[in-house]
Structures are given as structure tokens and as C-alpha cells.
Amino acid sequence: MARQVPLNRCRNIGIMAHIDAGKTTTTERVLFYTGITHRIGEVHEGTATMDYMEQEQERGITITSAATTCMWNNIRINIIDTPGHVDFTAEVERSLRVLDGAVALFDSVSGVQPQTETVWRQGDKYRVPRICFVNKMDKAGADFEHVIETIRKRLGARPVAIQIPIGAEANFKGVVDLIEMRAILWHDETMGAKYSVEEIPADLMKKAEAFRMQLIETVAENDDEMLHKFLEGETPTVEELKKALRKATIDMHVFPVLCGTAFKNKGVQTLLDAVVDYLPSPLDVPPVEGIDPSDTSVVMTREAKDDAPFSALGFKLINDPFGKLGFIRVYSGVLKTGDTVLNPRTGKTERVGRLVKMHANKREDITEIYAGDICAAVGLKELKTGDTLCATTDPIALSAIDFPEPVISVAVEPKTKGDQEKMGIALSKLADEDPTFKVRTDEDSGQTIISGMGELHLEILVDRMKREHKVEANVGEPKVAFRETIRKASEAEGKYIRQTGGSGNYGHVKIRLEPNEPGKGFEFIDAIKGGVVPREYIKPTEQGIREALQNGVLAGYEMVDVKATLFDGSYHDVDSNEMAFKIAGSMAFKEAAKKASPVLLEPVMSVEVTVPEEHMGTIIGDINSRRGRIEGMEHSGGSQVIRAIVPLKEMFGYVNDIRSSTQGRASYTMQFARYEEAPRMISEEIIGRNQGK
């Protein structure tokens, strides 16, 4: 079967925003207008097509990125609906990695919110062109121009309006299209499916002309031909303007801004038109880069062509009753059911059992998938998030997806003996699906410890364990995931010599430890010369050091941002073995870490509190009492927004405290910012507690 939709008519987009800006509602409207659903699903009724997990329908939030395919004006659009809640950052990170473009939604009153900043930064990191949609224009206090200003100021981006609203709040009727200079009004009685194109209202004409001039001026800055016309006083044609705006958007010089209200069915069709007109097809983005698995210094590229060697990235896993579904984005070549593909991470080949196109939680079997498309594959047992799949004859390893480390952990134990084994299986399946969810066993207590990105994240995972895997568990109090690091360089040796009956054990290494850049993690350098430590014992030494990192020397927390150089050692012809060098590496590391001024690090959070003026003093005093630092304040609507950095340790239970101190009138959002050195008092308290004083 040949390709049905040419590559230039494909769009892979994500919908990204702060929680509650209306992402899922917007996607539901898109599915309705593109003819996929015959009834609009509502988030508040719990019937939204994209929110297909039970907890999503109960809580009215999107947890997993559901992928779906629809057609608009003969263009195939693959949409990934991403969660806006900070605890599910991993879902956003993995979606953006495989998208070509995105729609960023903004609340018409709040504008840029904390999670908007996070997802916007992730979009910048993966260089994803975006168009902006100011949603909820029917809301009291809606202010289109204020939102554009917050995009400019807080995101440092260049927004450019391609529409302006007609009316606002309850009187929001439609938009002025600044490209074609016409008014578009939606009819309520047709669920917004029909709209009329009219003359621009006289009272808006001047404003529309000023905004259009601004649009042409901004676009002309990046287009020589248009700049020349502009300076000559000529007006560009609609086609010229669209073409120049498309180029400027794909190059990320500008971000077109539209408006509407998805819930009231206004503005969705024009948003779809903009996706088609201004967001890139797989042909508009640079070829994907990777490395040669057999020689990591060789950089390779793959063009989005069907006749190129096959390459794809696995960006999401779902375990369901029918087996493991692996969502993949195909970058080059063609994949057919029954094909054998290579996973460079494992070095193993696997056979693709089935290929399915997903529509939220419904699926349609397909026989092949082409370059630039997204689908799910069944039968890939070894696939993990971020893995490359490629042709066995032309291997390539695409760059993996970076995920943040978990910041909070709780102990879980099964309620009954019978749940013990089931819990282990359930947790490993959940950890398979979610790279920011970690499971380990505490060496001292034997308890199972699960870690994640926040309280809601862990709560939902425990809930899924109960619903999907029928495992009842008791959950302990949440604990902060502290870390340890070092502040100066040191050297130490590890010597492991044991004589037991026949052959003995002999391992001897010398290492140099030094601080690594924050966020760089662990780095191992092999500086052995003259074979004083044979090649086959280098890897075991590194492994021993890596294992020792898991239990720091101060309070048993993982050590981060450390560089270890193996520079000397010795071996015994008969008694040396891998195990002896692994133990020697671990001993040397512990010894060196003790001498390298180890310190305790704690996660600090970026907190934003929206509070009425009269409660400002209370909130600021409370933040200071939690060891917080106020970073800035600004006016928004009738409230003040306070931005602060506060240690996570001090934020447990904040939701109840803030409610009671402001009679429920303040709200806050919080997300992980970074790790910072803990003050001495806190360090002593934690170290003392962990050493059982």
C-alpha cells in the first residue's frame, strides 16, 4: 500500500499549556470539527475522548499524552494532548521531543502562568515552532492584549497577533482576521460548526489596521523581499504575507497569536487553519541527528524520506491488557508489520507484531507506517522510553530524551502477603511507562520506596496500582529526596585482598574525585597508562563507583555532580577478577568522598502564589518562615502574584495552610527549580536522623 498523505501535508503537533488553560477541551473541539467524534466530550462531565484513564475522568486533568490522528483540509494532523500539571513534566518533555510544532494555550485572564514558562522552555530546548491561542475569551476579565504583553515579557518571545477579538467576556462573538482583513463570527446554534465571514465592524477598523501594520513590520524584519516592499510603501498580498509568516514561524523568529473560546466553540476552525498554514511539516524541519552506535564520535543524519533507512524514536509506553504498546515517531524510511528492527541501546533485534494508529484509547490496525508519522507498535518487549529503533542494516542511535530526577519519595507496602508479588510486577510496569517514577528497596529497612515528581504524581501511581493491577498498598509519609555532593578534589585508593582456600581476590585502584558542574551528573574518566589496571577491570571499577554513588557518605543519599578519574592501581595474574575490582572501586570512592568536603543538597521549588492585596503580608511572612526567598511580585487582575524560591521540605501541607490563612482566597503553583546546598542546621538534623542518633 503506497503512502496516502504526502509528507508536506502532515503535521505533528502538541497542545501545551498551564493546567486548566483548556488543552483537552480544545483537542475535543478539534476532533469534533475534523469529524472524528460526533459528540463533543466535556472535561467537567468526565466524557472527554482524550482523557481516557479513569483517574483523568474523575479529576478532570490530563495525565498521559494521548495521541490521535485527524484530517483537516486534506492535511493529516497528529495531535498529542499533554498534561499541564507540573508533576507530569516528563509527559510534556517526551512529547515535545518528537513533535514538529505546537499550539501553546494561554488563559485570557492569567496570561503566562508558571507551568507555561516550564513548557515554553522545553519547547525552546527542542526548537519546536509554536502558535499561541488565547483561550477562554468569554471569561470575566479577559484581556487579549495583556496576554500578548505577558508572552513578550515573561517568556522573552516575539508574539505577533494575526487576529484580534470582536467583543470580550460575555460579548465575545468572533475575531478579525488580520491576514485577510475580514470579520469571522460564530453561530451558537450550530455548536460553532458554522460561521459567517463579514465586513470588519467600523469601530474596530482603525485598531485592526494598526495591528496589521505591526504584523507586516515584524514579519518583514526576517524577509528581505517583504522588507523591500514595505519600505517602498507597497502592501504585500495575502499569499506573500502567509508565506513570509510561515517562514518566520518555522524559524522561531515570531509566534503567531490567535484567540477564541474552545468551550463555547469559537475560534477552533481558524486555529486549525493556522496549524496547517504556519506550523512545519516533517520536511520543514532539519534532518534528525544521531550517532553511529559502533563509533559514538561519528554524527549521522536521517532525512524525512520513505526511501531512507528506517529510524524511529520510542517516546511512550503503555501497558494494557493486550500487551505493551510502544508509541513511536518515524523519522525516516518505512516500517511494516512483521519487520525486524534493531534497538541500539540493547544491541538486540525485535520483531514488530502489529502497528496501530491511535485515536485516544481506540485503535485502528495498519500494515505500514511512513517517515514523519506517529503510531503505536505492539510486540516490542525490550523498548524503553527514549530508545531508537532502526534498520538492522543501517544502525543509528538518535539522541535520547532527558528526564528530571524525582524529588519526593514515599514508602509503600502491600496490605496482604498475596499482594507482595503482584506489587513488584505492578511497580515495574508503571516504572516502565514513566521515566520519572523510580522504585528501589531500602537496604536498611527492606521497605519498597517509590519516588516521583510530586505528591499528586505518586498519589496517581498508587491509585493506578490499585485500579489496573488490583494491588492494595499502605503508603507512608512523603519524604524529600535529598542528594549529596562534594565541594573539593581528593584522592584515595581502594585495595581489596581476600585469601579463601584456593584462588583469592585481588583488586587495587587509585582514584581522583572532583566536583562536576551542577546538573552534569556523574562522569568517569579512565586515565590508566601502561596497563597497570587491565582493560577488562576498568568497567567493573566504574560499576563499583556507580553503585557506591547510590549511598552517599553523609546521610546515605545519592551523590550527584561528581567526576571520578581512575589513574593508578595494580593487579595479580591469578587472583584478580571483576568482583574484586568492583569492590576496590567502591572502597576508593567512599574513602575519597569523605575527604572531599561532602555536603547535603535539598530540592528547592519555584513557588507562585496569587493572593488578594489584603493577604499579601500574611503570605510573605509565611514564605519567609519557610526559609523562602521572594524573587518578585507583580499585579495581575485584582490580585498580587508573588514569586519565590522555597525548599520542598518546608512545603508539605502548604495547600491547607494557605487556605486557612486566606479563607481560601489564595492559590499557588509549585514546581522543581534546582538543588541547593542545605543550611548547616538542616544538614545536621537530617544526618543525625539518618545515622540513628
UniProtKB/Swiss-Prot annotation:
The keyword Cytoplasm applies. GO terms for cellular component: cytoplasm. Keywords: Cytoplasm, Elongation factor, GTP-binding, Nucleotide-binding, Protein biosynthesis. Residues 8-283 form the tr-type G domain. GO terms for molecular function: GTP binding; GTPase activity; translation elongation factor activity. It holds the Pfam family EFG_IV. It is found in: Cytoplasm. The keyword Nucleotide-binding applies. InterPro entries: EFG_II, EFG_III, EFG_III/V, EFG_IV, EFG_V, EFG_V-like, EFTu-like_2, G_TR_CS. SUPFAM superfamilies: EF-G C-terminal domain-like, P-loop containing nucleoside triphosphate hydrolases, Ribosomal protein S5 domain 2-like, Translation proteins. GO terms for biological process: ribosome disassembly. GTP binds at residues 17-24, 81-85, 135-138. Belongs to the TRAFAC class translation factor GTPase superfamily. Classic translation factor GTPase family. EF-G/EF-2 subfamily. Catalyzes the GTP-dependent ribosomal translocation step during translation elongation. During this step, the ribosome changes from the pre-translocational (PRE) to the post-translocational (POST) state as the newly formed A-site-bound peptidyl-tRNA and P-site-bound deacylated tRNA move to the P and E sites, respectively. Catalyzes the coordinated movement of the two tRNA molecules, the mRNA and conformational changes in the ribosome. This is Elongation factor G.
